[in-house]
Swiss-Prot record:
The lineage of its organism: Eukaryota, Viridiplantae, Streptophyta, Zygnematophyceae, Zygnematophycidae. PANTHER family: RIBULOSE BISPHOSPHATE CARBOXYLASE (PTHR42704), RIBULOSE BISPHOSPHATE CARBOXYLASE LARGE CHAIN (PTHR42704:SF17). Keywords: Acetylation, Calvin cycle, Carbon dioxide fixation, Chloroplast, Disulfide bond, Lyase, Magnesium, Metal-binding, Methylation, Monooxygenase, Oxidoreductase, Photorespiration, Photosynthesis, Plastid. The keyword Magnesium applies. One of its GO terms (molecular function) is ribulose-bisphosphate carboxylase activity. RuBisCO catalyzes two reactions: the carboxylation of D-ribulose 1,5-bisphosphate, the primary event in carbon dioxide fixation, as well as the oxidative fragmentation of the pentose substrate in the photorespiration process. Both reactions occur simultaneously and in competition at the same active site. Belongs to the RuBisCO large chain family. Type I subfamily. One of its GO terms (biological process) is photorespiration. The basic functional RuBisCO is composed of a large chain homodimer in a 'head-to-tail' conformation. In form I RuBisCO this homodimer is arranged in a barrel-like tetramer with the small subunits forming a tetrameric 'cap' on each end of the 'barrel'. It comes from Spirogyra maxima. The modification N6-carboxylysine is found at K201. InterPro entries: RuBisCO (IPR033966), RuBisCo_large_chain_AS (IPR020878), RuBisCO_lsu_C (IPR000685), RuBisCO_lsu_C_sf (IPR036376), RuBisCO_lsu_fd_N (IPR017443), RuBisCO_lsu_N_sf (IPR036422), RuBisCO_lsuI (IPR020888). This is Ribulose bisphosphate carboxylase large chain.
Length: 475
């Protein structure tokens, strides 16, 4: 026997395959304040015990592999391994379990959402022993969150920048999302902004297409912003989408927006990637730009109840990576979103400290230790009749974004925006007077119609429009 073989044998190395649970299932483990904690919803294959499945998740997302390797003896597995420390069955679901996994902080690069996700939601999601796997929540300890810059500015600084307080902000996505020339696009922006809007927005897939190159769009939109500001005396903005095919091109677009003096730009953070998003967020803080985030591709990742990543995790990741706004669903519009679940991740975006609350899908207490908050953006199939519910659900620190609910007004863009602004002001005033918007909302809107023909026309157009479908992703 060679000396090397003798050394390995003496160290206790034995080739072969061991059950994961012998090493990675540790129900006696007491979690540390510095651990990153994860809650996985797992569906094991028939015949796979939940303890083995949970241990496999912990192993494959940290230090483990499918067989014993002699190089395990060159490190300290007890220090670096992930641990499945608890498993509970999912009520009302057959063969589904919540596996709780603790990860030592040293497994992750500081300030990198990319590295965090590569480990925790990497190869393990294709593991054959699992029929399905979903990451429901993460607990990010202060020791890790403090390594991130977070949002470029946060909503408190944003309010100071645009000098608007005491109400939700109003936005509008320009429609049709594709096909307008740059000049006509700028015209639509101007009509909306002069009518009472705070922001207008590029849609997520508006980048630099043959019918409208990005530089032309930026120029005509900047002209529209300055003209609307001069007429209204209010600070206005448009989310100029800087998303591009390369990071270098993305930064070029951000720099041009800064040169034009506009207040805010935009990024598609999931399709663009976390590395690109974090780089852009750093640029925005250094150069005084607000950053609006669109979540295009989110439903591909989070809509199925038993597999993928829940949006509350993607929301936490965005807060660390950086963004001042992010689309969060509406509860009442055309997009998926159950009320309590939505309010749970809205609080995770905005608040400093959020208590564990399983009724809202929050599996862990989260302390952001003064990281700036992100404004949730309610967007997708909303119109003036939704305004009372949106005001009550999201409160002042939010952006209410009407696309078709502005541009679909029978009298045009500016009257559409007037209708939304009047409806919002009426709801905020009624709330401040102590009225119950959940019960009296429709009456508040009807009263406001007496003073605004634009609102009355909008109410008539959309009085029958509802999106009443069962929510797929429930607790």
């Amino acid at each position: 026997m060679s000396p090397q073989t003798e050394t390995k044998a003496g160290a206790g190395f034995k080739a072969g395959v061991k059950d994961y649970r012998l090493t990675y299932y540790t129900p006696e483990y007491e979690t540390k304040e510095t651990d990153i904690l994860a809650a996985f919803r797992m569906t094991p294959q028939p015949g796979v015990p939940p303890e083995e499945a949970g241990a496999a998740v912990a192993a494959e997302s940290s230090t483990g592999t499918w067989t014993t390797v002699w190089t395990d003896g060159l490190t300290s597995l007890d220090r670096y391994k992930g641990r499945c420390y608890d498993i509970e069955p999912v009520a009302g679901e057959e063969n589904q379990y919540i596996a709780y996994v603790a990860y030592p902080l040293d497994l992750f690069e500081e300030g990198s959402v990319t590295n965090l996700f590569t480990s925790i939601v990497g190869n393990v999601f294709g593991f054959k022993a699992l029929r399905a796997l979903r990451l429901e929540d993460l607990r990010i300890p202060p020791a890790y969150s403090k390594t991130f810059q977070g949002p470029p500015h946060g909503y408190q600084v944003e309010r100071d920048k645009i000098n608007k307080y005491g109400r939700p902000l109003l936005g509008c996505t320009i429609k049709p999302k594709l096909g307008l020339s740059a000049k006509n696009y700028g015209r639509a922006v101007y009509e909306c902004l002069r009518g009472g809007l705070d922001f207008t927005k590029d849609d997520e897939n508006v980048n630099s297409q043959p019918f409208m190159r990005w530089r032309d769009r930026f120029l005509f939109v900047a002209e529209a912003i300055y003209k609307a500001q001069a007429e209204t005396g209010e600070i206005k903005g448009h989310y100029l989408n800087a998303t591009a095919g390369t990071c270098e091109e993305m930064m070029k677009r951000a720099e041009y927006a800064k040169e034009l003096g506009v207040p805010i730009i935009m990024h598609d953070y999931l399709t663009g990637g976390f590395t690109a998003n974090t780089s852009l967020a750093h640029y925005c803080r250094d150069n005084g730009l607000l950053l609006h985030i669109h979540r295009a591709m989110q439903a591909v990742i989070d809509r199925q109840k038993n597999h993928g990543i829940h949006f509350r995790v993607l929301a936490k990741a965005l807060r660390m990576s950086g963004g001042d706004h992010i689309h969060s669903g509406t509860v009442v519009g055309k997009l998926e979103g159950e009320r309590q679940v939505t309010l749970g991740f809205v609080d995770l975006l905005r608040d400093d400290y959020i208590e564990k609350d399983r009724s809202r899908g929050i599996y862990f207490t989260q302390d952001w230790v003064s990281m700036p908050g992100v404004l949730p953006v309610a967007s997708g199939g909303i119109h003036v009749w939704h305004m009372p519910a949106l005001t009550e659900i999201f409160g002042d620190d939010s952006v209410l974004q009407f696309g078709g609910g502005t541009l679909g007004h029978p009298w045009g863009n500016a009257p559409g925006r007037v209708a939304n602004r009047v409806a919002l002001e009426a709801c905020v005033q009624a709330r401040n007077e102590g009225r119950d918007l959940a019960r009296e909302g429709n009456e508040v809107i009807r009263e406001a119609c007496k003073w605004s023909p634009e609102l009355a026309a909008a109410c008539e157009v959309w009085k029958e429009i509802k999106f009443e479908f069962d929510t797929i992703d429930t607790l």
